[in-house]
């Protein structure tokens, strides 16, 4: 079998969960999200990475229309990393989330299209993943990024 990290991306403001966006094998993870909009929009992304091992984990990076964006590492423990970012978008945009820049891996990342005008979304390119989209975001998934008293809810023993 091989190494596999689990990657979920939540577009909180649109109530969309992009699940299992990780490659089927290997320690490279990421996806491309194409957003269609016709007006200024505030968008919150939460990225949940569940590594298979804890020795060394590649950091997650984000680009918005080719420009680097700082992802905030909100939470880190042995079984998960939670990143977040709030963006203000003015027009159609492309988000790249990635751990690698090597094209051998990035060409296998999935591509998801989200039409914020028509509230429509679909997987344009699956890559070598089992990516799927859920909307609305499952209540149990929301616990991954809900805070209670300033701390993320610990679901390790749920």
Curated annotation (Swiss-Prot):
Disulphide bridges: none
Pfam families: Pox_C7_F8A
InterPro entries to which the protein is assigned, alphabetical: Poxvirus_C7/F8A
Gene Ontology BP, a term: viral process
Similarity remark: Belongs to the poxviridae C7 protein family.
Annotated function: Plays a role for multiplication of the virus in different cell types.
Protein name stated in the entry: Probable host range protein 2-1
Species for this entry: Rabbit fibroma virus (strain Kasza) (RFV)
